[in-house]
């Protein structure tokens, strides 16, 4: 029989929607030689701000 382990849901991340500007937007980010540029065209649904799409 394998040993039992305890899993805690709060370890690592919290579920839910976070404001984009608080979690991903870094205005003072400096690019590195290893960075890869990827571009996507996104059309927000009605009522969704463009920066949140």
UniProtKB/Swiss-Prot annotation:
**Which species expresses this protein natively?**
Malus domestica
- Provide the protein name: Ribulose bisphosphate carboxylase large chain
Gene transcribed to yield this protein: rbcL
* One term of GO molecular function: monooxygenase activity
Catalytic reactions on record: 2 (2R)-3-phosphoglycerate + 2 H(+) = D-ribulose 1,5-bisphosphate + CO2 + H2O; D-ribulose 1,5-bisphosphate + O2 = 2-phosphoglycolate + (2R)-3-phosphoglycerate + 2 H(+)
A Pfam family assignment? RuBisCO_large_N
Task: Write out the GO biological process terms.
Answer: photorespiration; reductive pentose-phosphate cycle
Annotated propeptide span(s): 1-2
Q: Which PANTHER family match?
A: RIBULOSE BISPHOSPHATE CARBOXYLASE (PTHR42704), RIBULOSE BISPHOSPHATE CARBOXYLASE LARGE CHAIN (PTHR42704:SF15)
The PTM N6,N6,N6-trimethyllysine maps to 14
Record's GO cellular component terms:
chloroplast
